[in-house]
A protein has these predicted regions:
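Non-catalytic, topology-defining segments of multipass membrane proteins
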Residues: 1-229, 274-321
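Active-site-proximal inter-transmembrane loops
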Residues: 168-176, 238-264, 269-271
Length: 321
């Protein structure tokens, strides 16, 4: 277990029940899995035949894809992950709400649920109880493949649900964030279809509207989803581990830009409350760059990151293994 993460870090009361499981919760999880994990992937497959037989690819398709991919990706890494889960920095109330909204557009789950699941992941990283470890299904080839599939995708079908009163009491007290959490489904569905509405109104062509839904909605959600899920699966199996963390987290710096800095996963597990994942010069971290921009605008403060001496000491521990 990652000893750096403690109950005190998140003000988690010890007496609460840790997880819940019921037919109602299981039904909600299956519904979400179908709506935001199966359907977007199926609809993404329609993109190629649609452009082969119905309409050519437009520049606006690529633009709406890239724009919403960046907005939702930063919403997850800067908002859901660094701000709400790890409290790695403080932000203006309107910025907090905007980041929660952008994260909800990604279709990765309501912000409070997401934070609760991720806090439990850090508490029990790669140990029994970790919601999405790939390392708990045995070391045979079949067990490893099953673990990777579990961590990447199938864990979301149905799983023990972390008690939000236990793990995220701080977020439940935030009325604005609780409001975004409550309207998650409406926000995520709007993220699928509003791009098509905008593209259709701008061009006044139904083909542009369909392309907007496919590229800005389903394809964007599917691509972003797989990059996030790959952190859970592949980066708890493969890559570099310069820091000793007590789990199986790894780095994959060559895809740090595509993951908005999340690919520095071993760095993150070594310093979970750091707003900066790319800890050294040249280690690309768009999420950190976004925090820096917010800070320069006076919209973020109390930035948490390890100093150079601590980083170097932890790196030396890693080299001495």
């Amino acid at each position: 277990m990652n000893s750096i993460v403690t109950h005190a870090e998140f003000d988690i009361p010890r007496h609460k029940k840790l997880v819940s499981k019921s037919p109602y919760i299981a039904a909600l999880q299956r519904r979400h899995f179908f709506a935001f994990d199966i359907v977007p992937n199926m609809m993404a497959l329609v993109v190629v035949p649609y452009h082969l037989y119905v309409a050519p690819v437009r520049a606006s398709d690529v633009v709406v894809f890239l724009l919403l991919w960046a907005v939702t990706g930063l919403g997850v890494t800067v908002g859901y992950h660094r701000l709400f889960t790890h409290r790695a920095f403080a932000a203006h109330d309107h910025v907090r709400t905007l980041l929660a909204f952008c994260g909800a557009l990604a279709g990765q789950g309501p912000v409070i649920s997401w934070a609760a699941i991720h806090r439990r992941h850090h508490e029990l990283s790669d140990e029994p109880g970790d919601p999405h470890s790939p390392n708990l299904h045995g070391q045979t080839l079949r067990g490893r493949l099953k673990g990777l599939m579990h961590a990447h995708y199938t864990w979301m079908i149905e799983h023990d649900y972390p008690n939000v009163a236990h793990y995220t009491a701080d977020l439940l007290k935030d009325r604005a964030i609780a409001g975004v959490n409550r309207h998650y489904y409406a926000i995520a569905l709007a993220g699928l279809f509003v791009p098509g509405l905008i593209c259709g109104l701008v061009t006044w062509q139904w083909q542009a509207a369909v392309s907007g839904i496919l590229w800005g909605g389903f394809l964007r959600m599917a691509v972003l989803g797989h990059t996030i899920w790959a952190i859970n699966s592949l980066l708890h199996r493969f890559g570099a581990s310069p820091f000793v963390t007590g789990d199986h987290s790894h780095n994959a710096g060559f895809v740090s830009l595509l993951t908005f800095g999340e690919a520095w996963h071993n760095n993150h597990h070594a310093f979970p409350t750091s707003a900066k994942f790319g800890l050294r010069r040249g280690w690309s971290d768009p999420g950190w760059w976004t925090v820096c921009v917010l800070t320069s605008l006076g919209l973020a403060s109390d930035i948490r990151q390890p100093n150079e001496s601590l980083i170097e000491r932890r790196l030396q521990e890693g080299r001495a293994r």
